Amino acid sequence: SCNPDIIGAVKVPDGSVDPFRLTAANVLDAKLHGAKVLVYCEVTELIKEAGAVVGVKLYNNVSKQYEEYYAPITLNAAGIWGQHIANLAGAKINMFPAKGSLLVFGHRVNNIVLNRCRKPADADILVPGDTICLIGTTSSRLPYDQIDDMKVTADEVDLLLREGEKLAPELAY
């Protein structure tokens, strides 16, 4: 499925991880080890005793209630939202969010990861996974106050399709 007009290639051992399965496996493992997994919740406050964080206060966006949870260890694993939680702890960090869009195709066109050998740019990797493949990603800076309001644009879809076809023309169909 590679573009027949490619004039050169380098074989590089590469692979991919299914992020959905990895996330599900991490959640299941955490639950097996006693974790309580919460979704649709926002940390609003860190609960401290003698200067140490002993829990969190959160807002549950489903029940519309505030809840408190206590634990011997509190871990900030909030990804891009981690800046807010770090600020609650008095740690000032500046994260620089970037929006990355990708396209997932309902069919697979390649059996190996295809990367472009160039400086990182939009749509420079085609990744197979089970019965699908994906092309991505775009990367554009985003103001921190807009991280909860991201949408894929038609221009991004067009760019991903156009650039993806250069790796595998079959993506045009």
Show where each model-derived region lies.
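Short strand-connecting beta-turns/loops that link adjacent beta-strands
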Residues: 49-52, 63, 119, 131
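Active-site substrate-recognition segment that forms the wall
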Residues: 68-69, 77-173
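A structured beta-alpha segment of the ubiquitous adenosine-cofactor-binding alpha/beta core
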Residues: 57-68
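A conserved short coil-to-beta-strand element within the FAD-binding core of flavoproteins
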Residues: 39-55, 59
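Helix-loop-beta segment of a Rossmann-like dinucleotide-binding subdomain
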Residues: 1-33, 55-57, 138-148
